[in-house]
Amino acid sequence: PLHIYSISQACQNALMCTNYQIPNRERLTLHYGDLPHGEWREVMSPLYRGLFLRANDGGQELVVGQWGMIPPRSTSSVPTGKDGKRLSTFNARREGMARSWTYGEPWRRGQRCIIPAESYVEPYWGTGRHIPWRFARAGGAPWGLAGLWSEWIDPSTGELLPNYTMLTQNCDAVPVLNLMHRPDPKRP
């Protein structure tokens, strides 16, 4: 079962589908085991440090990383394209993954991950204007959202920065999710 909550008008412009909430430390430990060292946010927006779960040496590990995949040739942790313009890489459409210069290599290498989330927010457009809706599991257990991870090395400092993106796909066949996002005749 699913709980859907309408978000207050005050939050309307800030949240949209660029927001999710990570479970608190106690719930993370209960559901995922040992916590990583480092700091992360519980209320997530793009480019914040969050958590993802990946396979490691026959097991799994929670990793602190930046939400927003950084292309390999980017000169900054703010994702940029070949032309130097800022990219939105926090969500990646599954349908185009293999052909993407940002996501293609991690996809082919099988760098899938699970993103722990207490809830996530999507824009409802049934009224003709966006109204943020928060989705959470009815039983209160966290979601495990599909993701893809990579590691980027800062060319100026040599620091290794894990990063990740949330996988999305067309949901027109799912009645509730079909109501989300502004209708776009150019996209399936």
What is the role of each PLM region?
Residues 2-188:
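Short linear sequence motif anchored by a di-proline
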